[in-house]
């Protein structure tokens, strides 16, 4: 096989494989739980949403609910750990939100990032903007949460996801 024949075959194959090489798992569920709630015990408490709850969350947040079941853990001493996914530009971003006992955001962690660009959303300073936000916060990109150039869709969708999870807390978790 000549070099040109090899290049003719290898180039299309590499184009198919290349996008997947940008996917990165930064944290497992256990690692994210320890990062957000160090030294705390967490108990799985998945929530299956009733149609009325799903509709109420969508109305309260203005964000579509993609799944009827939400992966949730109750934190000893109060608080919640919620695992979620949003679509970045083309691929899913898996992230976790830690909520304090009062329902305010304690911390968010980006666990899996599969997009080619926009990984800057993992930056601690960007993620820290969510701390203290509640369901009463407006959570608008470019107003409450600063955008990152080159990561606009990832920023917008994480912001929308957190807003949806805060509404989820109010409707499905708060007692």
What do these predicted regions represent?
Residues 1-9:
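Bacterial N-terminal signal peptides that target proteins for export
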């Amino acid at each position: 096989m000549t070099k040109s024949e090899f290049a003719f075959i290898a180039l299309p194959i590499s184009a198919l494989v290349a996008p997947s090489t940008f996917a990165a798992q930064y944290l497992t569920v256990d690692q994210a739980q320890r990062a957000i709630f160090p030294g705390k015990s967490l108990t799985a408490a998945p929530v299956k949403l009733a149609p009325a709850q799903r509709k109420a969350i969508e109305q309260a947040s203005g964000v579509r609910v993609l799944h009827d079941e939400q992966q949730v853990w109750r934190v000893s001493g109060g608080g919640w750990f919620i695992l979620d996914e949003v679509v970045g530009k083309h691929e899913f971003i898996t992230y976790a939100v830690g909520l304090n006992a009062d329902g305010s955001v304690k911390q968010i962690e980006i666990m899996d990032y599969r997009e080619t660009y926009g990984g800057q959303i993992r930056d601690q300073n960007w993620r820290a903007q969510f701390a203290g936000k509640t369901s009463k916060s407006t959570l608008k990109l470019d107003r409450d949460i600063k955008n990152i150039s080159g990561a606009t869709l990832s920023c917008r969708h994480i912001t929308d996801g957190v807003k949806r999870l805060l509404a989820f807390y109010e409707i499905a978790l708060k007692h």
